[in-house]
C-alpha cells in the first residue's frame, strides 16, 4: 500500500472515529487484525458491538457505498469479529452489528448499520 493511500485511509478512519464518538460510541480498537482479516473500527454503545468498515471518498461518488461489501469482505469481517470475541470474552453477550461508515470530504459521514 502506498504511503498516500495509507495516509488517506488513516484520515478517513480518524474522521469516522470522531463521528462514532459523537454518536456516543466508545472506540475499542482501530485497525484490528486477526489472521489475514482486518476491521477498521470496533466500537461499543450500550449492549451492541459495532464492527465498522470505513470508506473515504475525496470526491462525491454517484453510487451506493454499501456495494463495496462483497461476499469476500463479509467473510473476512466475520472471521475477524470471531477472533475479537474469542480474545475479549467480556463482549460475548453483546449484540453484533456489521457496519459501514462512508466518509466524504465534502458531504460528511453516513452510517450504514446491520449490513449483513
Curated annotation (Swiss-Prot):
Pfam assignment, any one: UPF0102
Source taxon at top rank: Bacteria
GO MF annotation, one: nucleic acid binding
InterPro entries registered for this protein in UniProt: Restrct_endonuc-II-like, tRNA_endonuc-like_dom_sf, UPF0102_YraN-like
NCBIfam families, A to Z: PRK12497.4-3
Family assignment from sequence similarity: Belongs to the UPF0102 family.
Protein name (Swiss-Prot/TrEMBL): UPF0102 protein LIC_11564
